[in-house]
Swiss-Prot record:
Transmembrane segments: none annotated. The modification N-acetylserine is found at residue 2. Residues 24-308 form the Protein kinase domain. A motif (TXY) lies at residues 180-182. Signal peptide: none annotated. This is Mitogen-activated protein kinase 14. The modification Phosphothreonine is found at residues 16, 180, 263. GO terms for biological process: 3'-UTR-mediated mRNA stabilization; angiogenesis; apoptotic process; bone development; cartilage condensation; cell morphogenesis; cell surface receptor protein serine/threonine kinase signaling pathway; cell surface receptor signaling pathway. It comes from Homo sapiens (Human). It is an enzyme of class 2 (transferase). The gene is MAPK14. SUPFAM superfamilies: Protein kinase-like (PK-like). The active site is at 168 (proton acceptor).
Amino acid sequence: MSQERPTFYRQELNKTIWEVPERYQNLSPVGSGAYGSVCAAFDTKTGLRVAVKKLSRPFQSIIHAKRTYRELRLLKHMKHENVIGLLDVFTPARSLEEFNDVYLVTHLMGADLNNIVKCQKLTDDHVQFLIYQILRGLKYIHSADIIHRDLKPSNLAVNEDCELKILDFGLARHTDDEMTGYVATRWYRAPEIMLNWMHYNQTVDIWSVGCIMAELLTGRTLFPGTDHIDQLKLILRLVGTPGAELLKKISSESARNYIQSLTQMPKMNFANVFIGANPLAVDLLEKMLVLDSDKRITAAQALAHAYFAQYHDPDDEPVADPYDQSFESRDLLIDEWKSLTYDEVISFVPPPLDQEEMES
């Protein structure tokens, strides 16, 4: 929120009261989830179409309050072309005492990668450009020591020019319930995170990129498991059962015992699975879809892969400023998280306006 308090107006949409600054007009609901509802709006100040998200019960519990603080801190930190950033954050409250609602404003993104894949099988050049942008955004996110954890086609927004932004990063802390059954939430998940094998690292996101890339190349979900076990079987059928070296790294004894009970399977020849694909694409997939996360390619390494020769520019693949997430280990009361969040709202400085965007 800027220092001059704007004039707010109230309106009811889908049984929710929205109280927003006058600059945001023509609010229309576009969706709602567990953590809030989203309206499309027209920003009269910039001429941009924006998404306004009203967080639902942001301070109802310590978990909610910490999540609210986390989301705001993350969005404020992200300043990269391939990562969703914050255009504005506001509250109708005039003081900390009456602070109960948080609204976040981001670019309104038309389609997501799901819509794109459903409509058409993509050319190899499209796949190069889309995956290059995902990796460019991931290099930035990972450099801040943030793990997305939930990369999937519906979390990748794409506009008419095929320009891509990563959404909803670093927030995902999925419940077992949301991961159960025939659900996309799990199809793109690295095995070590899905099955709690071990402490995971940033390359869980690279596994997801491999799954997404395979889907763009073939038009089919790579591992559409019906449950955790079926999912693991589909994965192992392609990449082979773990060898002794990886088994040693799996800290969960039950997971180790289960894997050892399975019939040994060799890794398939990816060229026979992705018939007709660019051999460089197949080579990159083999480096991403590696069971041992220590041996998986990183985002920075993948950007330098020959598959992206026409897009790779080492001078234009920026890293993030350091991101202080020491708050993650803090145990605070609701009012303390709320006060920290209020400070973040008040201190927000809007990004400089991008001329190109305003003209488009």
